[in-house]
Amino acid sequence: MKHSSEVVIAEPIEAVIPWVSDLSLYPQWMPLVHVAEALGDNAWAVELRAKVGVFARSKRLRMRRTHHDATRIVFEREELDGRKHSDLILEIELQQEGDTCRVAMHMAYGGNLWTAGVLDRVLASHIDAGKSGLARLVYRA
């Protein structure tokens, strides 16, 4: 499953980077990220949760920031239990466009938790909902 979403925020890139580079802040703006606790060494314990009516699906995993520069941030699943796990990659691309910042979010998941058709759409809607949450927080900061 892959999903991409973009938002343009009327703020400079420097105002956006703190909100997208620290997974601990994602629960404030991204409905998909229910909990994200910093573990140190650019790693977080994350619980992803998506609701379908009264039902919820959740997944706990360890994510690590594997790339961070002025225009691109990448988080990848990196478990430490020695077992093989499905890939989960979240890539954030930032582009300054005049007085605005274009934020592109790309999520790729290789597992089957979210692949039941309906859950794909729910996951995509949760990611899309994060766009307005991110813009609200950046404007308030």
Which residues does each PLM region occupy?
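Hydrophobic pocket/interface hotspot
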Residues: 16-20, 26, 44-46, 65, ...
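Hydrophobic/aromatic beta-strand elements that line small-molecule binding cavities or substrate pockets
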Residues: 5, 33, 60-67, 87-96
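Hydrophobic ligand-binding cavity/cleft-lining segments
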Residues: 1-43
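Beta-strand/loop substructures that line and gate deep hydrophobic ligand-binding cavities in soluble
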Residues: 76-129
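Short, intrinsically disordered, mixed-charge
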Residues: 18-31, 124, 128, 132, ...
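Glycine-rich portal/gate segments that line the openings of hydrophobic small-molecule binding cavities
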Residues: 37-79, 136-141
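Solvent-exposed residues in well-ordered beta-strands and their adjoining turns
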Residues: 8-12, 47-51, 66-68, 93-97, ...
